[in-house]
């Protein structure tokens, strides 16, 4: 009572783990002819002394990645995205997660043929763009786009760009790597914003709060292609409860202390000791083995809203689909995204420009241009030490069955530390799929929606059959009546021959054609024509009265 506590932010406003899409969920889960298969490789450029107890594959440099992925390329996979777990920044102190990378590979399959598509194989190539020192960030982008377009003119397909700052070198020649947090104050600086002492519960998703479509995200894939060492079993992400976070006790942090230079003191004095910083830019391309076409790439600048607490980034937000949907509808494919925080203001809220690189529609394919639908996922990746416990791979595998292709993963410099020592970082995942064919709808009457199209067609068919059967029945009766009239007229015309009269039973009528005359066997009918015939031939009447001749009797 009497305590003036700050109001907690609404979870709907700052709740991570959100999914944004141009479609509704039933349309997102509509199966198409194409499916995808994903696998990934986690690797690091740090040595075992710098990063002990890690299952990540160790590479001497990013230049060794094409050789490392050669076996997967021979199996039909190709690189789809490449990113560090944490976005590198211009800070002098570097953290371990900036030097741990993930490469996601994809293989396309055809659902209808139940066979893999091998129409276009690739080889992975790397281009070392530049090693820049004290160059403004906004000047890097035009130079990089020019490099990408030059490679595209040679038939290469751009995949990803990885900017990497070289680690700081001390006077003893060893690299100094800053842990995520080495004190209670550092942990609070990472997780608390100015004037807000709320817990990580407001910024870290729980399984019960996220959308149903992200329910599978909090599961770790069982296999890790290309990884070395034993991977510890997956556990719960370790996201603390509100009571645990609000306790005023100490934060026992573990798992991310560097192995070297632990006695050099607080690394926050780095800017004075090491004013010189270099950044290396590596660009990765897929070269098609068979057909090579010239691709066009263009940049799109999107404003990103950054919240900072001192030099620590606490949040990063943007209206993703608002700025990208128009490019998706016109057939643009997102390939990669880069941004630097040097353009952001030093105030609490600042804006920085994110540069998103799109592949334009080829001029050769203008006649078959089709738009794309998109999904954007704001995903929190949780790590225990350096081992991933929660990430986007389960969600990616579930969407692969519906033909969604991963195009880009944008890491952020956001880091939050929990009481258990786990670290969570925010990553933005982009997926695309060709638009579903639009069904043409006919204008129907007001109440036609009660019946399906098949039921309406069946009712119309039965109705037409009923009308047809009634008309056929009437026509058959008329034909039968006309036929009886024709028989009656044919029996009254011609010569009549009487055999032995048998009046006690019905006579048998047979029609026999001899030339053009009609002969009727049996008793002739009593009509006016037959009477007129008897009176007009008296000789025939006399013969009939005399009876049959002997010759006829025989």
Swiss-Prot record:
Compartment list: Cell membrane; Cytoplasm; Membrane raft; Endosome
Membrane topology label: Lipid-anchor
PTM sites of type Phosphoserine: 183, 199, 507, 530
InterPro entries attached to this UniProt entry: Raftlin
Biological processes per GO annotation: B cell receptor signaling pathway; dsRNA transport; membrane raft assembly; positive regulation of growth rate; positive regulation of interleukin-17 production; protein localization to membrane raft; protein transport into membrane raft; response to exogenous dsRNA
Region (Disordered): 192-249, 441-488, 504-554
A GO term, aspect molecular function: double-stranded RNA binding
Coiled coil: none
Keywords: Cell membrane, Cytoplasm, Endosome, Lipoprotein, Membrane, Myristate, Palmitate, Phosphoprotein
Subunit record text: Interacts with TLR4; the interaction occurs in response to lipopolysaccharide stimulation. Interacts with CLTC; the interaction occurs in response to pathogens. Interacts with AP2A1 and AP2B1.
Family, similarity comment: Belongs to the raftlin family.
Protein name: Raftlin
Species this chain originates from: Mus musculus (Mouse)
């Amino acid at each position: 009572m009497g305590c003036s506590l700050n109001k907690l932010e609404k979870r709907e406003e700052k709740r991570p783990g959100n999914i944004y899409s141009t479609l509704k969920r039933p349309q997102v889960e509509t199966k198409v002819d194409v499916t995808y298969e994903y696998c990934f490789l986690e690797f690091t450029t740090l040595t075992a002394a710098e990063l002990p107890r890690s299952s990540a594959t160790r590479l001497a440099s990013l230049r060794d990645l094409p050789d490392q992925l050669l076996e997967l390329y021979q199996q039909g996979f190709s690189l789809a995205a490449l990113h560090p777990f944490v976005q590198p920044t211009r800070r002098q102190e570097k953290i371990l997660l900036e030097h741990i990378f993930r490469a996601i590979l994809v293989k396309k399959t055809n659902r209808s043929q139940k066979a893999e598509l091998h129409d276009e194989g690739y080889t992975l190539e790397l281009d070392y763009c530049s090693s820049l020192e004290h160059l403004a960030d906004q000047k890097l982008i035009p130079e990089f786009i020019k490099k990408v377009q030059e490679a595209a003119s040679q038939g290469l397909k751009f995949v990803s760009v990885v900017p990497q700052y070289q680690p700081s070198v001390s006077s003893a020649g060893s690299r100094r790597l800053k842990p995520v947090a080495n004190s209670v104050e550092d942990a609070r600086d990472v997780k608390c914003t100015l004037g807000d002492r709320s817990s990580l519960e407001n910024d870290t998703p729980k399984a019960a709060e996220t959308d149903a479509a992200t329910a599978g995200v909090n599961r770790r894939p069982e296999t890790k292609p290309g990884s070395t060492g034993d991977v510890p079993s997956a556990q719960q992400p370790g996201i603390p409860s509100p009571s645990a976070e609000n306790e005023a006790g100490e934060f026992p942090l573990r798992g991310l202390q560097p192995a070297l230079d632990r006695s050099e003191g607080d690394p926050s004095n780095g800017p004075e000791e090491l004013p010189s910083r270099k950044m290396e830019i590596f660009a990765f391309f897929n070269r098609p083995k068979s057909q090579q076409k010239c691709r066009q790439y263009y940049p799109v600048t999107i404003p990103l809203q950054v919240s900072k607490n001192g030099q620590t980034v606490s949040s990063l937000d943007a209206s993703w689909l608002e700025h990208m949907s128009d490019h998706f509808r016109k057939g643009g494919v997102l390939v990669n995204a880069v941004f630097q925080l040097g353009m952001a203001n030093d105030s609490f809220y600042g804006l920085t420009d994110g540069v998103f690189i799109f592949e334009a529609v080829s001029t050769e394919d203008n006649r078959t241009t089709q738009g794309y639908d998109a999904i954007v996922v704001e995903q929190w990746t949780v790590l225990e030490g350096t081992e991933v416990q929660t990430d986007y791979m389960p969600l990616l595998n579930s969407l692969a069955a519906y033909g969604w292709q991963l195009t880009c993963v944008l890491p952020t410099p956001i880091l939050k530390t929990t009481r258990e020592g786990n670290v969570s970082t925010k990553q933005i995942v982009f997926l695309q799929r060709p638009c579903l064919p639009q069904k043409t709808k006919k204008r129907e009457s007001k109440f036609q929606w009660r019946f399906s199209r098949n039921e309406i067609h069946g009712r119309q068919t039965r109705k037409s059959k009923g009308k047809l059967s009634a008309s056929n029945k009437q026509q058959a009766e008329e034909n039968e009546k006309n036929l009886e009239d024709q028989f009656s007229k044919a029996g009254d015309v011609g010569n009549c021959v009487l055999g032995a009269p048998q009046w006690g039973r019905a006579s048998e009528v047979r029609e026999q054609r001899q030339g053009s005359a009609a002969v009727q066997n049996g008793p002739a009918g009593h009509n006016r024509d037959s009477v007129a015939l008897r009176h007009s031939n008296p000789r025939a009447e006399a013969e009939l009265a005399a009876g049959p001749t002997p010759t006829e009797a025989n």
